[in-house]
């Protein structure tokens, strides 16, 4: 059962935004897509402003939406790794286009890059 089963969408774009929207999901996807498989604490280090609770929730939602794969290894201490599914990998061209658009828009509106927090 998908997390989207009980929701209604007017168009496909609305569904896409429901899956990747929010403050943190695109950053999580970006790091997994650009840097490959990561453990929880590695993601937490890459996204320092995210709380542990929010990171857990966002990863669970992305897993439920079949965008992120969670691999649990039967070792002590527990080892869990996160990676993109093929469906998650298919989002990378979209995220790359959004990155390029944002970079161009930042120049257009003349945002001081030193003031803007670098999260990528």
UniProtKB/Swiss-Prot annotation:
Keywords on record: Activator, DNA-binding, Transcription, Transcription regulation
Protein name, UniProt field: HTH-type transcriptional activator HxlR
Functional description taken from the UniProt entry: Positive regulator of hxlAB expression.
Organism ancestry: Bacteria, Bacillati, Bacillota, Bacilli, Bacillales
GO molecular function, one term: DNA binding
HTH hxlR-type domain span: 11-110
InterPro entries: HTH_HxlR (IPR002577), WH-like_DNA-bd_sf (IPR036388), WH_DNA-bd_sf (IPR036390)
Gene3D superfamilies for this protein: Winged helix-like DNA-binding domain superfamily/Winged helix DNA-binding domain
